């Protein structure tokens, strides 16, 4: 087993996380490594987390925000939990988007958190419900105030 990097927060996400990348260190101590990419699919994020784990690059806290760009299955959530099984703090973020799979993805995430008690939920979907002003007109990507709120919620979820 490769040791984790103490004091490092590893984050993997898509363009929503990318929109907050400049704010993600706010309220956090230690090193923040965020790898967020436009149109990232769940399987690519899982591959990255597996690579970080296997090479000793993974922090002792991990935040995952995937599922905006396609389905996230129960099997993939279980795989995620398995990859991160030795990580003391794991947070998975729900999605907010205009796609038909949004509710299915969020249900998978909520069920996964119930199945894996060591995984925490950051319910971005619920947090954004009263704050349409945090998002651009596409209902998904972050305005500056949304990026600040996202970063604050991420920091809070890690405490």
Protein language model regions, located:
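Short conserved AdoMet
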Residues: 57, 85, 114
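Catalytic His-Asp segment of secreted/periplasmic serine-dependent ester chemistry enzymes
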Residues: 102-159
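A short helix->loop->beta-strand "cap" motif at the edges of active sites that frequently abuts
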Residues: 86-89, 118-119
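A generic structural signal for ordered alpha-helices
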Residues: 2, 58, 87, 125-128
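Conserved SGNH/GDSL esterase-like catalytic core that processes O-acyl groups on lipids
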Residues: 2-79, 97-107
């Amino acid at each position: 087993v490769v040791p984790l990097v103490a004091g490092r927060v590893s984050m993997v996400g898509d363009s929503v996380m990318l929109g907050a990348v400049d704010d993600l260190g706010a309220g956090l101590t230690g090193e923040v490594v965020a790898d967020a990419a436009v149109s990232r699919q769940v399987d690519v994020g899982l591959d990255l987390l597996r690579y970080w784990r296997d090479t000793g690059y993974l922090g002792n806290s991990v935040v995952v925000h995937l599922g905006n760009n396609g389905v996230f299955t129960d099997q993939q959530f279980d795989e995620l939990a398995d990859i991160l099984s030795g990580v003391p703090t794991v947070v998975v973020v729900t999605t907010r988007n205009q796609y038909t799979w949004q509710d299915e993805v969020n249900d998978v995430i909520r069920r996964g958190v119930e199945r894996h008690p060591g995984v925490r939920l950051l319910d971005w979907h619920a947090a954004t419900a009263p704050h349409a002003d945090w998002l651009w007109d596409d209902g998904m990507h972050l305005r500056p105030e949304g990026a600040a709120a996202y970063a604050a919620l991420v920091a809070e979820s890690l405490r």
